[in-house]
């Protein structure tokens, strides 16, 4: 098997013309599409409806081509959106395909997909979510033929947060919630999903985990998890990326840790991990080898970066996640020469506090 990677620009959350063009010219067979990961131009908060707008737009395009209903398309293709394209970040989507291929001489990009059950409001940000994500991670590894967790470089999880309607439902039933603040629930949801990845990959032990540590014991974390929460989902979608000896194709993935949002060396480290050594910015030729970059952005909990105070955490007008996404997006784009980057905010249990994961998929050099 091999994984194909196709990045398209989006002029609006409902712009599917890029994918339609790829299909029309035969570059993508819709029957091979297994996942789509993208950035929309909303605010990234609990009231960001651009994500829920984008998914049905792509489902409506693909449904007649696959002979399915739009709802059935959503059952066989994973759609993961992150809202917020602040600064230079450009709205886009990356389409992933899977098709038959001979095995390569060295491990190549593999992608496993797991879907959890739906969660009740009182389970969001709790151990039920942690355990379900961990089970999905195990399933994804089995799908890809990856047996060594060190070969896993990026695990994208998108799941539900607590909307006002879900909070009201829980109150009516007398169910206790992790929090009753919809925007505040993002930290608990993201944290639970990240700890699920950490548990599934053996980065933390089951005895270390409980409801009480989620979004609190930040010394417990995964180095490869990237989690997002939105009101448009009831379950968690888990996409596990690694390099598998059972796969062929043209791509490899690598990862690194960003010490802060201006860590250019961390960006270069992720590219090098994927097989592309870069001293400063990439050359135009090497830029064409970079298929996609995924990163998380976080404001330092100290309120300072490299000894200099900033106002990310104290700005009453702009959420700190939006500040962080804008800053990191500019740093990455200055190196890769492409502002169509998947940068998501909030890193609860995703690397150590203040740090953040970054992964890059690169076209492999000839071997």
Each PLM stretch: what is its role?
Residues 1-367:
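Terminal domain-initiation and capping elements
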């Amino acid at each position: 098997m091999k994984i194909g990677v196709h990045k398209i620009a989006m002029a609006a959350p409902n712009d599917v013309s890029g994918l339609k063009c790829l299909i029309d010219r035969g570059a993508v067979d819709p029957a091979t599409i297994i996942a789509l990961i993208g950035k929309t131009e909303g605010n990234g908060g609990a009231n960001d409806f651009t994500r829920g707008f984008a998914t049905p737009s792509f489902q409506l395009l693909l449904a007649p081509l696959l002979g399915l209903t739009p709802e059935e398309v959503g059952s066989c293709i994973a759609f993961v959106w992150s809202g917020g394209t602040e600064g230079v970040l450009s709205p886009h989507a990356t389409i992933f395909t899977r098709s038959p291929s001979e095995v390569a001489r060295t491990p190549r990009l593999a992608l496993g997909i797991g879907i959890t059950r739906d969660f009740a409001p009182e389970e969001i940000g709790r151990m039920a979510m942690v355990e379900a994500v961990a089970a999905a991670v195990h399933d994804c590894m089995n799908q890809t033929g990856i047996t060594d967790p060190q070969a896993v470089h990026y695990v994208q999880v998108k799941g539900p947060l607590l909307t006002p309607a879900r909070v009201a439902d829980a109150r009516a039933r007398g169910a206790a919630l992790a929090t009753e603040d919809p925007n505040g629930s993002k930290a608990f949801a993201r944290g639970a999903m990240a700890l699920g990845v950490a548990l599934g990959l053996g980065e933390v032990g089951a005895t270390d985990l409980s409801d009480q540590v989620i979004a609190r014991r930040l010394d417990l974390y995964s180095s490869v998890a990237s989690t997002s929460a939105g009101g448009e989902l009831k379950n968690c979608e888990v996409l596990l990326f690694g390099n598998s000896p059972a796969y062929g194709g043209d791509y490899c993935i690598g990862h690194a840790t960003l010490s802060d949002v201006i860590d250019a060396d961390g960006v270069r480290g992720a590219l090098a991990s994927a097989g592309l050594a870069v001293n400063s910015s990439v050359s135009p030729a090497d830029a064409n080898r970079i298929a996609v970059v995924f990163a998380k952005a976080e404001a330092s909990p100290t309120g300072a970066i490299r000894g200099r105070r900033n106002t990310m955490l104290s700005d009453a007008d702009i959420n700190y996640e939006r500040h962080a996404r804008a800053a990191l997006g500019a740093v990455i784009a200055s190196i890769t020469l492409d502002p169509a980057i998947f940068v998501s905010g909030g890193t609860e249990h995703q690397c150590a506090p203040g740090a953040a994961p970054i992964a890059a998929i690169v076209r492999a050099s000839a071997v």
